[in-house]
Amino acid sequence: LEGVHKSPKGREWLPFVVRLYFYGGSEQVKMVHSFVYDGDQNKDFIRALGVRFDVPMREALYNRHVAFSCADGGVWSEPVQPLVGRRILTLDKTGNGESSLQQQQMEGKRIPSYEAFDEKNRALLDHWASWDSYRLSQLTADAFSIRKRANDNNPWIGTFSGTRSEGYAFAGDITGGMGLELHDFWQSYPSSIEISDAKTPVAALTAWIWSPDAEPMDLRHYDNVAHDLNASYEDVQEGMSTPYGIAR
């Protein structure tokens, strides 16, 4: 698949090629995305670049889940609406058996529908926070962060940090979802994986090839004067020190 990126104002630049690989008997799809820089290095800076997928969300907020890989095989996961607060959620006066509803939720089990709870417990569900967006960002080779926010009008807050994430994310509900792995995630920093619109019927899962959390991609030469070949192997010549045509 070949195409070109188009800005909201209509400008077309950064041609790309997408290759898709399908395997018999497997639900996995491999996608290879390549793009070519064809801009002006002195004025065209890439703020962010990514590939976005839609993920249907069919269940109640507390039956929706997100997860990110951390370092050394670790996983960070959370429900879109965690069932935790000052009061314990219960189904009836006798309790909920061997484990709490909050524990069952963390184990990925189905929590009963809203209508199954009495008025007191519905009030808890009505007032507990839910989260719309999550972002895993690897901005250096040795540090990643996981942040989340409730909505577009409020700030991102930190939830976890570590060294080198393996670049995997999941978004979905207890009936299914979508997993995504960005190859060479920490090696190709600054990169991010973002889950947004998690509280809507269709969430977005975005693999950021260049993270919006980082400084814009600046492909200019590091200096504007020559440093003499006798002193160092560097030179600056008109039309020579240019990134035009490089690809990733």
Feature annotation, model-predicted:
Residues L1-R248:
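Beta-strand/loop-rich accessory regions of lumenal/periplasmic or secreted enzymes
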